[in-house]
A protein has these predicted regions:
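N-terminal export leaders
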Residues: 3-7
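Surface-exposed short loop/turn segments
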Residues: 19-32, 38-41, 98, 103-154
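Sec-exported extracytoplasmic/periplasmic mature domains
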Residues: 97, 101-105, 195-203
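Extracytoplasmic/secreted envelope proteins and their assembly/folding machinery
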Residues: 89, 93-97, 184-187, 191, ...
Length: 203
């Protein structure tokens, strides 16, 4: 009888062990926007070139949405409680479309699948978006390829230029919100460089 009592009480004892562990603190997740706005809006040129913006691809590790920082020791850390609202490469693609439309350089800015024929194509890869804690700076980096499409079905597309662009912004504070704001500013500075490049090679 005593043995049966011990066996029956064992699950209750094990269940009671859970109450001895400290309760895990709830940490809410926050989504931060990555939507740098163009500095101004200029109406489209009626006779301007047509720009095709291909989707910017993410470098390995940048497919995820967590904010990243580089520690003074050189290790990369990802914050899984502070996230971008959309993956950074997607946000950069949309930002490039918005900035190109607002620049006034182009009669139309299109994406793959459009029936319009482009005069210029841009594609690239987002290779870095983080806060460098050693310098207290946000840093954004991408590789850009600008292409002139083939003039006819028998022709070949011609790369016009390739460039690796880097932009920074000072982090004003030590909160996740300050880090997100600085990275957004760095992306805006990056897009400014891209627009200068596009203006240089626009027909």
């Amino acid at each position: 009888m005593r043995r049966r009592f011990l066996l029956l009480s064992a699950p209750l004892s094990l269940a009671g062990c859970g109450s001895l562990l400290p309760a895990q603190k709830y940490i809410p997740r926050t989504s931060w926007p990555l939507q740098p706005q163009p500095p101004n809006y200029i109406p489209a040129r009626a006779n301007g070139p047509v720009l095709l913006v291909r989707t910017i691809s993410p470098a390995p590790g940048l497919e995820q949405r967590g904010l990243q920082c580089l520690t003074p020791s050189g290790s990369l850390k990802t914050d899984y409680y502070n996230l971008w609202a959309v993956p950074p490469a997607e946000a950069l693609t949309q930002g490039l479309i918005n900035w190109a439309q607002a620049s006034g350089h182009f009669s139309a800015v299109i994406t793959p699948g459009s029936r319009l024929t482009p005069d210029l194509i841009i594609e690239g890869e987002l290779s870095e978006l983080l806060v460098d804690l050693a310098t207290n700076q946000a840093r954004a980096q991408m590789t850009v390829l600008i292409i002139k499409p083939a003039l006819n079905v028998t022709g070949f597309a011609q790369p016009v230029t390739q460039a690796q662009l880097t932009a920074t912004a000072l982090v004003q504070g030590n909160t996740p919100g300050a880090q997100a704001a600085a990275q957004s500013e760095a992306v805006a500075n990056l897009l400014t460089q891209v627009m200068v490049l596009l203006d240089r090679f626009s027909p």
